[in-house]
Structure formats: structure tokens, C-alpha cells
Amino acid sequence: MGQTVTTPLSLTLEHWEDVQRIASNQSVDVKKRRWVTFCSAEWPTFGVGWPQDGTFNLDIILQVKSKVFSPGPHGHPDQVPYIVTWEAIAYEPPPWVKPFVSPKLSPSPTAPILPSGPSTQPPPRSALYPALTPSIKPRPSKPQVLSDNGGPLIDLLSEDPPPYGGQGLSSSDGDGDREEATSTSEIPAPSPIVSRLRGKRDPPAADSTTSRAFPLRLGGNGQLQYWPFSSSDLYNWKNNNPSFSEDPGKLTALIESVLTTHQPTWDDCQQLLGTLLTGEEKQRVLLEARKAVRGNDGRPTQLPNEVDAAFPLERPDWDYTTQRGRNHLVLYRQLLLAGLQNAGRSPTNLAKVKGITQGPNESPSAFLERLKEAYRRYTPYDPEDPGQETNVSMSFIWQSAPDIGRKLERLEDLKSKTLGDLVREAERIFNKRETPEEREERVRRETEEKEERRRAEEEQKEKERDRRRHREMSKLLATVVSGQRQDRQGGERRRPQLDKDQCAYCKEKGHWAKDCPKKPRGPRGPRPQTSLLTLDDQGGQGQEPPPEPRITLTVGGQPVTFLVDTGAQHSVLTQNPGPLSDRSAWVQGATGGKRYRWTTDRKVHLATGKVTHSFLHVPDCPYPLLGRDLLTKLKAQIHFEGSGAQVVGPKGQPLQVLTLNLEDEYRLYETSAEPEVSPGSTWLSDFPQAWAETGGMGLAVRQAPLIIPLKATSTPVSIKQYPMSQEAKLGIKPHIQRLLDQGILVPCQSPWNTPLLPVKKPGTNDYRPVQDLREVNKRVEDIHPTVPNPYNLLSGLPPSHRWYTVLDLKDAFFCLRLHPTSQPLFAFEWRDPGMGISGQLTWTRLPQGFKNSPTLFDEALHRDLADFRIQHPDLILLQYVDDILLAATSELDCQQGTRALLLTLGNLGYRASAKKAQLCQKQVKYLGYLLKEGQRWLTEARKETVMGQPTPKTPRQLREFLGTAGFCRLWIPGFAEMAAPLYPLTKTGTLFNWGPDQQKAYQEIKQALLTAPALGLPDLTKPFELFVDEKQGYAKGVLTQKLGPWRRPVAYLSKKLDPVAAGWPPCLRMVAAIAVLRKDAGKLTMGQPLVILAPHAVEALVKQPPDRWLSNARMTHYQAMLLDTDRVQFGPVVALNPATLLPLPEEGAPHDCLEILAETHGTRPDLTDQPIPDADHTWYTDGSSFLQEGQRKAGAAVTTETEVIWARALPAGTSAQRAELIALTQALKMAEGKRLNVYTDSRYAFATAHIHGEIYRRRGLLTSEGREIKNKSEILALLKALFLPKRLSIIHCLGHQKGDSAEARGNRLADQAAREAAIKTPPDTSTLLIEDSTPYTPAYFHYTETDLKKLRELGATYNQSKGYWVFQGKPVMPDQFVFELLDSLHRLTHLGYQKMKALLDRGESPYYMLNRDKTLQYVADSCTVCAQVNASKAKIGAGVRVRGHRPGSHWEIDFTEVKPGLYGYKYLLVFVDTFSGWVEAFPTKRETARVVSKKLLEEIFPRFGMPQVLGSDNGPAFTSQVSQSVADLLGIDWKLHCAYRPQSSGQVERMNRTIKETLTKLTLAAGTRDWVLLLPLALYRARNTPGPHGLTPYEILYGAPPPLVNFHDPDMSELTNSPSLQAHLQALQTVQREIWKPLAEAYRDQLDQPVIPHPFRIGDSVWVRRHQTKNLEPRWKGPYTVLLTTPTALKVDGISAWIHAAHVKAATTPPIKPSWRVQRSQNPLKIRLTRGAP
């Protein structure tokens, strides 16, 4: 056996607990891993001889320590605890280290080295820690070793440290029994960071060039002594205090205490700052400290010498043994503290202060301390400053707990309260709070009281309900329903009427029933409670009924107990069963008759079959009754046995009745499925863990909790819970309770919150909770969905497997757990006082509604079932999320596989629903399909769902229909072609216009669903055949597989081709159709071999495609898809049946696709690209487009070799391609009827004429994206011009040739002519427009009789050779052509008559336009767009306003706004008397009808009497019901003026302007903004301003000018001789009579002046101005028909208000040829209408 080598490192690791104890004694903490790392990897790199296995050599340890404690960036502060611990182990070795440490030699006693004078050499400088320069003192010639007095050098019994020395320092150990003194040259200088251990262990060191300065303390003998900082103290200060940036106050206080207690030197201050501050923080502190240096005058100084003397950055030469040196050090510390305080001031952030709030259980005193600390930390304010007490007090009140803050705000004389008073009051409130135990007791007591009250109320209601039920049941004698009143009356039996003195008991007279002697006396026995008394068929009272037979049935998903009542003619429901019909019937009972309604017809599944039945709805019936109607349909048999009555069917089986809702009626069409797993089935008992009914909630045991990753920028979202009805809350409460009990929901506190949405289940009163997780889904990372596609999922099911098992996992998502870190994402609010829940709940399992839940569960279940698939390779297992399909070839294999699957699911923790299970059957339903015998069918339920949808009325309903029907498109041949008319209506912004085409397509899709065939399941072991056909741009096909000699369809495919492919010839369209359907068929064939059969030779086309039709990209795509010989093969050309898309038995006529394509490649068959030998002309065309002076110029030219035939400038911005097309088209036009060779150097124009033009035309000139191609009009013009020449050859030549051939000369001349035309000739857009529009050439002109008559009047001549009329040397354009041209031009420009006329005059048209000006005016006037937008030029003459005949009878009112609104007055209510012009104005704060009524009744009526007429605009204050009601009660005729017509209220509107102008001038003159104060002056000015008749309103009203007082005339004696009051009134009456009468006559004369009426008449069409137009909205609306008129206004059809004539303009309508003639008859009330023109 070998021996292990023990090293210092391994020794420490073996005794690690002792190492940790030693480190703890040094106040540090060490970790084993870092201990090994530093010892073996870090310290050996220091270059001091440290071995990788460690050492206990003290010299090496001290050298490593000096490296660790190095100042600046070269130090290692993180290694301080570890080297200090190594040092402690070496100095005081524990027992397990002593054998490895050499014994220490006892040092010889030597005398300590006394301080010596400083060196004359300059001290060495350091960037961060400059050396201290010792003071220069005379060096003694001979050092004194012994003292003069002969005393001992050091008191060995003293515990004081040795005296402070300049060069050396003697150290003593802790016991004081030894002393050491060595020279400074023997040991290197220690690091700046020192510790108390050095006083015991470090050998003394001294530098001949520096002096050491240490923290000073005064010893017992009066000498300064050095006490260095401990490394553990520095380490603890660093780690146990926040950083300076985080909390500068706390660190400043710490440094201040250290400076006060330790009195550090300059070096130790640097050491302290370097340890506690970062580099940036230290620089900031030093800078602030230097700013605080003050000069001789006591103010901060910036003199460098004074700043450096007081606060040096390098080590100063201060002598700390002198008072002056110590004073320097004290000043340095003070400045350092000032720098710390100034650097620690953070910017003001009151938001942080406001964020400090009192905690629920925090005392006010503690809260106040936190608040003050926030003030100190985030603001420059001192919270202890008396000036800041108010701010602190307000923050304390507002940010206290709500209950404390509210009570503090209500304190009396709050301003006089000090902060201490507020704290004491808050403490008193805080101490009076309820304790948690008291609060819990109070809540418990209130809950118990509430529960007691609820229980008492329920008991009372139950008792009342029992009494009412017994009372009604005892009174009910029969339930008879009759549709006829006479039957009801005939069947009644009335109680015999009693006389007044007749006994009701014995029927004798003379006494009443209570005094009857025959009535038995004694205690009353218990009254028998009969629940129902029945009648026989004749209505007589039967004997006492037997025990009541009851049957529990399912109605609308809810169990309902029916009472079998053979006396009830009809069955009765007591609760609302859904919609009721309009039919009703009388129900006669003991208490009388009452009418009740019937329910709508319901499909009821009885034991005898399906029937339609309607129940009678009787809410006050005590029980639902099963009457004779349903008993008859049931063929029920009632047996009376000893145990009671039993109701059974005709075969003796128990009866069950199911009532369905209307939306579930489609299920009645389904065939009867195999019975589900019954509770007594062996499947349940054999596999109890696999079923949700017996195994409880599932839990996937092999799946780890899921962690939901968030997006990088996601932040928590909190959405409040929506209001929830009480019914909905009670509906979801049981579900929440169940989930809480199962642990799926747990209480939580989360920053996330999303609302809970209760969704009512159809046909029931039950609710289910649904959480709205849309906002959470936005913030969660997306994962790639791996859920299988239902479209091709069944492709993996071979037809040979015909035994199926279908399982539906219940609550599947709840089987997966959520990680606790992800659970808060799905929190929601829930409050239930009964359960003691008020807060948030969250999910511990994967929730529903989360976007990634299906993918996560599908992947987890796939992983768990992987072993099952491996162990059962003969079985087919398909999984779609939580729906599982198991298929086998035989029944035995299916049963064994099902058992194994159930066992596996149970062991894995998944639970299946027994109610939905379909076990070992040959026919099952899976994913909406019916699987049977290797085929899949559309279920009848799916068909009925589509058939039951009503005709769509909106795009959304149409999308729903197409989505539902699109699910079934595999069963519908040509579905895309059928639905083509419907898809355009689903686009956004399209008008939903449902026409005959849409209705036809809608019905065809429904009809196709009814005849949907069965499709075979894809068999991946057999090849597939794809039959493809194409028709009008729609690809149709059927995917088949051979089944014996027949072809069985697998899927019907259809799709619309893109616009480019739809424009190809039929053979190429077939290629595109095959490519499209091949891609869709690949989803079902899963890459298996495919044979394509089509009525075209597609393979040859794909191998040699015509490059003129296909682009390179399409060609490559088709070849890669269709020439894959391993997967795609082409069969022989076959003819297909259009109905079935299968081949016809007879052979079709073959055709050559390549030959057909060659024939259809161009537009003109004789068009060639070779020169014609006998051509009449050989021309050269060219188009040029270039930039000149920042503008793109363009031109086109047609030339020969030597001369220019045609050259024209084109509009700026024309492209070169367009110019080439225009030039080529012009050449073809000029060569009409001739043989032409035309050369062009444009590949674009050449290819368009020869190849692409026909392609563009076939596909409707659209691109592949469905947009119009560029240069559409030029391409169409070129295609039409190609047929004009007799023979034509378009030849391509190279551009810019330099040879001397005829081709080169002609091309150069054409290019030069095009450039010169573009530069010299201005573009003529009008001529260009006419020339480019081929229909407007003379060859197309057709003249009418009216045109010919006009031409003869003008004296025009007819050109026989050219076939058109000529006038003034120009061809004459007919009137109809002129109208079409000008109408097109106006629709392009929408210019007015004058602008269009000037444009045509300047353009010098080559044609004479017949009736141009008249047609132009008509086109401009009849344009609807211009009429809606253009302003009206019509001017309406001024009208006449009606005035009053005396003052105060007729007023005009209006509100005007005056800003700024002082004292809340923003409005001015102005009254103007129309007779005198007198004005009354009242400042108001609101513009309301209440203000108007108040001023009218309180101001106008008492002073001027009741007005007769009031006039105003249509403001809400005047049109409101309040104002109008007041006017009606007072008999005032309130006239509302036309809307948006200020002139109608001109007098008051002008007064508003006058008052505002006057107030503006007065405010400027007075220098105040108080317009309310200046309003009387403005009114005085308005009332005393002369009007149109030279009189002021004051003079008209009072008959004299206002009295004026001359304040400068002291003699007031003239005023004393005033006449009597009576005489003054008589004079006033005379003056008023003389003034008012002439004034009223003047007003009356104005009314008699004729007013020019507006030109509108009844029946005219007018446009009405839109007064409030939005952006890009026309300013006129209409046109409207005029119904009534006045001289200034009119009323139109469709607008209730009168409209001023200035707000309308005439609408020009195109003339309509009259088709009816109106004739008068003799009867004035009759007219005769006759068809046809008069």
C-alpha cells in the first residue's frame, strides 16, 4: 500500500472546521472552493514563491499578503479574508499544524531605534498614494542608544504601545514579554492596509526615504501612539454598509465616526476612502472637498496654492508631532467630511418621497423615521429644519394609513398642530385599532349572524312555500284543458249556493256551521296532506289516490321529476322551458280557470321512437305533470302492486324521456350509436384509474412542472375583473369550489391579473368559468405549434384497420403541473365571503385559454405514449391533443389494445371520459368524421348544422358559413368554383350585395352537402391517382385509389388559380392546376407515388415549356414539383366526366398542346420579325426619357433613314418604356392600310407587340398580385393598332449603333429626333389624349340628324374620301363624341367651365368640336362630385327683419362667450329690444335654459313687461323644453331663426360685437381684466349711441337724453326748480307719442318695400350646405326636393328644419326623357297619367 502525501492545503481541507473557526475569530468568512482556488491557482502567479500545495512559511505569506493588499487596481480585496486566515494559522498554529511549522527563535533583546531626522533626498511619488515627506530636522551626529537618565528603554509591564517614531516602530507581542527591532532595510515596506495583527506579528519596517504615518492616539504617558486599522474592520465596514451611491448618508456618518474616534492620518484617510468608495465616488468626494476650501476672507477660494495646502491630493509633509501638523490634519478631515456631504446630495425626487407609505402594521413613529430618511436621501431638505416641518407634516398625514390619515385630516385647528402633536394623535389612533384576534372575532361574529339570518329567511321561505303548496294542492281538484268554451262550461260542477241562515255542514237552516250541533267537537286531528287530487275522465271526484308514482326525466340537461297524473289531459312543465309559442289554452281548477301558454314544438325521444310534442307551461302548478298525451305516446302501462304504482313501457322496460333544446335538434338526426360505457360496465371496474368518473382528477406523473418563458420586454399586466351578475357568480361558484378542493386553484398575490368571464352553457342555467388570457398570451414567448393537422391526420390510418376505439381525455390540460414561478402569470380575482376568500386565485395546472396549452399537452402526451407505440406496433394510435383513436385489424386485437391503452393511461396519470368513450366498435365518430369500414363520412349532424344556417345578412355571417362549409370541402367536387361568387363579399370595405348569383351558389353548396359521398381512408401502401380538370381559372380534381377494378375517391380538391395563370391558354392553365392540386394532395398522400391523369399532354409541356408565357421562376417551380419521377408520374391523356371528374369510357379527341400554344402566342397571325420585301414604308421609332435640370423630359419620334415623319414631346415624368409604346403605336396608325416595316430598339415594345401583349390581354391586364399592369392604356392602344396596316413586320434592332447601315442611320435619327422634340417642343397633353384614344379618330365618327342639321347651318363640307365633315380646315367631332370626350376630361380633372374652356383653347385641338361650349357648360353643371364640393356663387338679396311696434314687445336674445372668464363668468346673455335698440346684458356662468328663463322672469318682465315675441338662434339653451315651455305658459311667440345664419339675428349679433369691442377698449384703458366690473360702462355706451334714425335707445325709451351732472359747477340751484312728477310724466307721455308713432311708421314702411325672393320653387332639386364638415367630406349634401318656400327660406324633403335660401344651391339633373304624360280631368281631384311622350 502506498502512502499519501500530506500538504498544507490538504491539511487545511482535512481540518476545515478548525479553519472556519480561526477565520471567524478574525471576523471574516471563507469558502472551501475559493480557498483551494486561491491557494493552488491564484497565489502561485504572484511570483513570491508560493507553492501550489500551500505553505506555512510566514515570510512567503507576508509577501502574498502585501500583493493582496496592494492599493489601486492591482490589489485583490476579495482575497483578504483568505490570506488573513493563512497568516493566523501560521502565527498561532493549531495542534495539527505545529508538526509542520519550524520553531521560532527567541529574538535577542535590542534597543528600539529612536526617531532619526528625515532624509534630504526627495521622497518617491505615487499616483494614488503619494509618500509623506518627513520634516527636515538636524540629524544627530551619533544616534543615542541609551537614555540620559539611565532608565529602562521600555516599561515591560506597561500595556501601552511603544512610542511613535519617525523612521521605525518597535512592536511587542500580546503578552509584552518580548521586543523586536530591526532595521528598515531588512524587510520590505508593508502594504498601506494594516491591521491589529501587525502590531503582534509583523516585523517592524521602515523606509529610509519615507516616514510612516498611522492613526494617532494619545497614550498614558502623553505621547502620540499609532493604532492601525484592522483588516477585519475594513472588511466589515465594506460589507455591512450600503454603497455610497445607494445611501450616502449612512456611509458619511460611518466615516465621520471613524474620523472622530480613530484620528486617521492622511494615508489612512486614503485607505479608508479606497476601501469604502469606488473610484468614481472617491474622485467626486475629493473634488467636492477641494471646492469647500475657504480663503483668508472666509469664502470658498479657487487659488491652487491655498487649495493644495489645505486639501492636498499627494502625501503632504505634515509633522504630526507638532501642533501645526495636527491642525492641518484636523482641517483635512473637516474638508473631507464636507466633500462627502456635498457629493452625497442626490437630485430632488419627490416621487420617491411620495412612494413612502405607512405599512398595515407599522407604527406612526417608525413610519415618520422612514419618511424623514426619504427626505434626507431624495431631497436637499433637512426634515429636522423647522422651516420644513409643514411639508413633513403634510406628507405624514397624506401618506399615513387610510384610517389614520382620514382622522388626522378632520382634526380641529390642524394648522396649529406641530409634527409631534400629529405623531401623538396618530399613535393614539394606531393603538385603538383592532387586533388581528379582535378583527377575526368580529368577522366571525358577523358571518355567524349573517348565516343565522340567511338560515332563518330560508326556513321562513320554506315554510311559506310548503304552506302555499299544500294549500294549492288541496284546492286543485282537476286539470282539464279544453279549446272550446262550451266544453269547459259543460264540464263544470258548481258548489250549491247557500242561503244566509243555512249551515254549510248539515245544510239545515237556522244556524251556521260553527254552531252546528252535528259537527263533531273536540281536539282537531292532523289534517291529511294530499299532494294532488285527480279526476276521472268525466270530471268527477275520484277516491283517495294511491301513493304518487313519479318519473325523473332529463329536460334541457337538467333532471326534472314528473308526477304521473292520469287525470291530467296534457303534460305540464312548471319552469321556463325556453321559447313559448303564441298558442294558449284554458286550465280549469278548483279555484277557477286561467289561461296558460304552450311551449314550442320539441323533438322528444321516447321509448317508442321520435315524436314532436309541446308541453303546457303552468308556473303555479306544484309539480311537473306527465299527462295522458305523453303516456299514450309512450304506450305506458301502470301497474298497482304492493310496493306501489309502477310505470313501464309496452315491453316492461323503465321509461326515460329526453327533451332537447332547439339548438340541439340536429342530434336527433344521428343514427343510434353503440351504448356508452355504463357505470356497471366491466371496463370501469377493470380500469378504475383510467376513468375520470372513478379515478378522479388526473396528474401526469412523468411530466415535470412547466415553466412558461416570457418575452424579453414583457411587463406584468393587471386588468380589473369585469362586473359579474349574481346569477353568473352563483353559477361558477361550485366550479371554483371544486377546483379549490382539488388543489388546481390556490390563493396567491400576483402583479398579474386577468378577468374571469362566466359563460352560460347553452340550454341550461349552468355557467362555466372562462379566463380571458389574451393579454398574457401577448407577453409569453411563442413556440412552434406541433399539434397535428386534422386535414391529414387520418392519412396515417390504413383502411385495413376497421375496429376502432375513441377516447376523450377529461380535463386534459389539468394533468400537467405549472412551476411555482409561472403560476402568478394566470392569477384572477375571486371573492367569496362564505368561503373566506377575497383576493386572487391562480392555477397550479396548465390552464385553458393559454395559447401554448394545446402544443404543450400534445407534446407531453406524445412522449408518454411513445413506449405504448413501440410495444404495440400492429396497432394504429392517432392523437389530436386530447382525442385518441386506436385502430386494429380485428376485434380481439382492438380489445387487447384498448385494455393496454387504458392501463397505460391510468398509470401515467391521465383520465378518460367514460361518457364519451367509444370502445371496440366498427363505427365511431372522430374529429367530426364518421369512420366505418375503412371510409370516412360526413356525419348527419355536420350536414344539418350547415343546412340549418339562415341566409347570411352580413360579411361575418357569410364567413361563418364558408368556414363551416369549408370543413366539408373534401366531399364537395368543385367547391372553389361553387363558392366563387361568395368570397368577394367577405372582403373588408366591400358592399354586401346579396344577389341571385350569391343565392344560387349558397343553395348549390347546401345541395352538394346533402349528396356528399363516402371517401376512402388513404392507404399509404398503394399508389394514388389524381384526376385533374380546369375550367375558367378554377382547378378541380379527385384523388383516388384502386379498390379492385374500381377507383375509390379519397378526396375532392379544388382551388382558384392566381390572376397570371388564369390568363394563360387552356393547356398552360392545366399545368398550373396540376401544380396547385399536387401540392394539396401531398398533404394526404404523405409523399407516396402519385399518378396524374388529365385531358392534356402536361408532361411534354413541363419538359419543354413555352418561355413566352412562363417566367423562369414559375418554370423552375413547376419542373421541380411535377418532374419528380420517383413520386410523380403522368398517365395517359383521358377525357373526364365534368360531374365526377373521373375518366369517361369513350376516348376523347386528342389534341397537340404545343401546336395549340404555337397558334395562340400572338395577336396577329401574319405578324413577323423579318423585313417585308415589297413594303410601302420602312420606318424607325424611338422613345427617349432623360433628366435635364432636375426634370425628366420625354419624347417620341418616327423617322425614315433621312427625314423625321413625326416627333412629339411627352408629359414630364413619362418613362422610356411608355415613350417607346407611343412611338410604335403612332407609326402603326400612320401606316393604316399599307405594308410596313418598322424598326424599334426597345425590347419592351417588341416583346409587347409579338408576345406579351396577348398574354396581358388574356389575363385582364393584371399582375400576379391582382393589380393593373403599368402602361395599360398604351398597351391596349398598341394591340388595336396592330391590325391597321395591311401587312406588318416589327423588327428589333440594336440601339446606338455606329455603323453606316440603313438600320444604324435610321435608329440614330429616330433617337436624335426624340431627344430634340423632348427639349424644344412643349408637351401637348390634350392632343396626346386625343391621339392615344383611338375611338375618337375620324374613322369612328357617326353623325346624327341633329349634328347634320347643325353642320349645314355652319356651312361645313363633307369629305367623301375620308368619311367625315370638315369645318375651318378641321374634322368635325359629333356632338355625342364631344360629350364623351369632355365628360372624360372633366372626370379626370374636375375643372370648371372657364378653366376647361381655356385649356381646350390653348391646346389647339385638331378637331372642331360641335357645340363645345354648350356641352362643356352642361358637363360642368351636371357633375355630382363638383356640386357636392364646390362653393356656391349665388347671392341672395337682403331680407327685412320684423320689429316691434313699441318698446318691450319684441326682443332678440343670444349668448356670447367672453374670455377670460373671471369669477366663473364666461358668458354674456344679451337682450336687444328690436324697436328701440335698448340692450340688457347679464354675465352668467353657464349657457343653459334655466339661466334664460330666470333672467326673463326676474329682469325683463318686471321692468319692461311681458314680451310678445322673442327671437333667437337654434342654440340648446333656446330650443330646450324648459325655455319653450316657459314661453308657451307666458304666451310668448318664440321665433327660432335659421340655423347657421347669423344675419337672421342681426340686431343682437351686431350688439354682441359692439359690447365686446367696447369691453376690450375699456380693459385696455383701465388696465384691468375684470370685464364684469366694466360692463355697465359698455351698456351705457350702447344705450346712448344714435341709431339709423338719429335717436339713441335711451331717447326712444325715455323721450329725453340721459341726465348729466356737471361736477365742476358748484351752483346746483337750477336743479331745485324741477317740475312736479305728474307734469314730468305727462310731458314724457307726449314725447313718447310723438316719437314712437313716427318710428313705428318707419319700420312699417320698411316691411312694405319689395324683397327680391330667391329663385327656388316647389319641386326643384337643391343641394344643402353641410355646416360641419369633417376631413375630406363634401360640403354639400343631397340633392333634395323643395316642398315649401318663403321669401327667405325653404323646406326640403328629408330635413325637418327650415333652411335659409343662402344655404342651398340649385342641383342640375340630366334631362330625363318623359315616359308618362299628365292630363287634367273634369274632376279637380283626379289626373290622368298616360304612358309615352306628349
From Swiss-Prot:
Binding-site positions, Mg(2+) 3: D1454, D1513
Residue ranges annotated as motif PTAP/PSAP motif: 109-112
Every RNase H type-1 domain range: 1173-1319
Entry annotation: catalytic residues: D565 (protease)
Catalytic activity as recorded in UniProt: DNA(n) + a 2'-deoxyribonucleoside 5'-triphosphate = DNA(n+1) + diphosphate; Endonucleolytic cleavage to 5'-phosphomonoester
Binding site for Mg(2+) 2: D1182, E1220, D1241, D1311
Ranges for domain Reverse transcriptase: 740-931
Domain Integrase catalytic: 1443-1601
Single GO MF descriptor: RNA-DNA hybrid ribonuclease activity
GO cellular component: host cell late endosome membrane; host cell plasma membrane; host multivesicular body; membrane; viral nucleocapsid
Positions of the UniProt region annotated as Disordered: 107-217, 434-498, 512-552
EC number: 3.4.23.-, 2.7.7.49, 2.7.7.7, 3.1.26.4
Motif (PPXY motif): 161-164
Matching PROSITE patterns: ASP_PROT_RETROV, ASP_PROTEASE, INTEGRASE, RNASE_H_1, RT_POL, ZF_CCHC
CCHC-type zinc finger span: 501-518
Occurrences of domain Peptidase A2 (ranges): 560-630
Residue span of region Interaction with host PIAS4: 344-392
Residues marked Cleavage (site): Y129, P130, F214, P215, L477, A478, L533, T534, L658, T659, L1329, I1330
UniProt binding sites for Mg(2+) 1: D808, D882, D883
Name of the protein this chain belongs to: Gag-Pol polyprotein
High-level lineage: Viruses, Riboviria, Pararnavirae, Artverviricota, Revtraviricetes
Gene encoding the protein: pol
